[in-house]
Amino acid sequence: MGRTLDYEFSYGEEITITPRNYEFDFRHAGKINTHYALIGMAFVSEGYPLYYDAVNEKGLGMAGLNFVGNAAYEDVLPEGETDRDQVAQFEFIPWILTQCASVKEAREKLSKLRLTGTAFSKQLPTSQLHWMIADKDACIVVESMKDGLHVYD
């Protein structure tokens, strides 16, 4: 998987490496201290890598692509009201790539996921995206829409 991230202008994105075991403190899904390393294109804001796309050390890659007018995300539920992992859409790429070595493992995580519309900040609102996740054996597309989370081969 690869792409050139061709835009007419730059958002300040840069090649970004997240080393193994860099602490991710996800907004709703807690902290992860032990995980795979990542490399990809990201805009780094307040020390946090907002990945456009990335690949982990196991060869699992993920890209967030425009899905304007179609993407819809879940509202955050109070703790204890859901048994699913609640992940903000801007954290989706590192949440998958830090924990999964394959598309098969990603599918398992997706079966327990609530993708939320939590914005990174007032200056960086929620993006309308869908995602491609691929390894050497498989590729899926993940879309969060009004009628739920969809996974396509």
Show the residue positions of the predicted features.
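Short, solvent-exposed loop/turn segments at the edges of secondary structure
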Residues: 55-57, 88, 126
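Extended amphipathic alpha-helical segments with heptad-repeat/coiled-coil character used for oligomerization
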Residues: 124-153
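Alpha/propeptide regions of enzymes that mature by internal proteolysis
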Residues: 82-116
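Hydrophobic transmembrane signal anchors and adjacent membrane-proximal interface regions, especially
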Residues: 71, 94-95, 149
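A contiguous strand-loop segment
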Residues: 1-81, 117
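An acidic- and aromatic-residue-enriched active-site/binding cleft used to recognize and process polar
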Residues: 4-6, 67, 111, 136, ...
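Surface-exposed patches in mature extracellular/periplasmic domains of secreted proteins
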Residues: 107, 118-128
